[in-house]
From Swiss-Prot:
Species this protein is from: Pseudomonas fluorescens biotype A
Keywords: Pyrimidine biosynthesis
Keyword Nucleotide-binding: no
Role: Non-functional DHOase.
Gene Ontology biological-process annotations: pyrimidine nucleotide biosynthetic process
Protein name: Dihydroorotase-like protein
Transmembrane segments: none
Length: 20
């Protein structure tokens, strides 16, 4: 899931924080 968070943070910083 870490990879998804890292990728999401590039697309949308809020998602990375968030963590989704």
């Amino acid at each position: 899931m870490k990879l998804s968070i890292l990728g999401a943070r590039v697309i949308d910083p809020a998602s990375g924080l968030x963590x989704v």
